[in-house]
């Protein structure tokens, strides 16, 4: 593998706009046209995926009220364009360490040779199952089933709070369900409606890919997970439906399916948090934990 591993950097304290809370999560964009999520504590700032260009990334950060003075890490879930198209620009702005698995990095070197074709400094090689720290945030990478080189999801823990980001997966293995338990903020894919996908504009081969066990979660699959107390433990303060297809789903339908599923839970396992839907076009309100 032709990239180097550097020592982890601590983040400076007290940056402009520091937040007197445990953790703030800003979902700046979510969908097939670009994904971008920022996690912040008073000390640390982590960007998960970089699917938007420089101008739009800066605009989304400003719209979410986030300081853009420094960034401590960029984490990439997998190499598909909607998760890394803006990565060269993001790294050019902030010079932040890049956390990525070796198979994903190999694909980035192939897909973006001008940026990643040479030996790089400031790259942290990670793997599924690994725990590591970025500033005062503990990160755990876990494997997800998707048609990419080495796709991963993440959980983040700090100051007694836990956040999980889990999108781009074809089904819900038990290990994934395990990682999503006891979260305060769960960001979960609800990509498509089965009927809309079947009659939609995608070619047959793409429909088969989306429906496969390495494709994307449907509203129905998410509903089955949310209705099952042995799957979703309902502890989350925020449940965010994410990566919603613009062609084969709509936010209202995804929300309706999730609400119906949550309504089927036994009373003793009722969900009392806030159900939200992330957007491709504008940042979701910052979620404070």
Regions found by a protein language model. Name each.
Residues 3, 8, 13-64, 151-167, ...:
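Conserved beta-strand hairpin/beta-sheet module of binuclear metal-dependent hydrolase folds
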Residues 48-51, 71-79, 99-102, 164-167, ...:
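Active-site neighborhood of phospho(di)ester-bond hydrolases with catalytic His/Asp-centered motifs
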Residues 102-153, 157-160:
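Metallo-beta-lactamase
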Residues 54-101:
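Active-site metal-binding motif and surrounding structural segment of the metallo-beta-lactamase
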Residues 174-277:
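Cap/insert and terminal regions of metallo-dependent hydrolase folds
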Residues 33, 81-83, 106-107, 148-149, ...:
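Active-site environment of divalent metal-dependent phosphoester hydrolases
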Residues 273-289:
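Short, basic/aromatic-enriched C-terminal tail that caps enzymatic domains
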Residues 85-94, 109-112, 249-256:
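Metal-dependent catalytic neighborhoods of phosphoester/phosphodiester hydrolases
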């Amino acid at each position: 593998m032709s990239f180097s591993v550097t020592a982890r950097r601590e983040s400076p304290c007290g940056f402009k706009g520091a937040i007197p809370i445990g953790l703030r999560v800003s979902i700046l964009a979510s969908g097939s046209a670009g994904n971008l999520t920022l996690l912040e504590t008073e000390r640390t700032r982590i960007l998960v995926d970089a699917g938007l260009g420089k101008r739009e990334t800066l605009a989304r950060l400003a719209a979410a009220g986030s300081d853009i003075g420094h960034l401590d890490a960029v984490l990439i879930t997998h190499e598909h364009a909607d998760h890394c198209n803006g990565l060269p620009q993001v790294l050019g702005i902030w010079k932040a360490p890049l956390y990525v698995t070796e198979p994903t990095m190999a694909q980035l070197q192939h897909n973006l040779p001008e940026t990643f074709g040479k030996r790089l400094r400031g790259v942290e090689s990670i793997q599924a199952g690994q725990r590591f720290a970025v500033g005062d945030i503990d990160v755990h990478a876990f494997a997800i089933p998707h048609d990419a080189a080495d796709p991963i999801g993440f959980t983040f823990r700090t100051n007694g709070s836990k956040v999980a980001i889990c999108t781009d997966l074809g089904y819900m293995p038990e290990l994934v369900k395990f990682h999503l338990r006891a979260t305060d903020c769960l960001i979960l894919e609800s990509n498509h409606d089965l009927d809309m996908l079947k009659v939609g504009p995608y070619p047959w081969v793409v429909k088969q890919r989306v429906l496969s066990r390495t494709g994307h979660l449907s509203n129905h699959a998410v509903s089955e997970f949310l209705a099952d107390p042995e799957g979703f433990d309902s502890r989350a303060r925020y449940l965010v439906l994410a990566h919603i297809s613009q062609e084969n789903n709509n936010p209202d339908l995804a929300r309706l399916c999730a609400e119906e599923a949550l309504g089927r839970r036994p009373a003793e396992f009722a969900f009392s948090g806030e159900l939200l839907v992330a957007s491709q076009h504008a940042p979701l309100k910052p979620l404070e934990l």
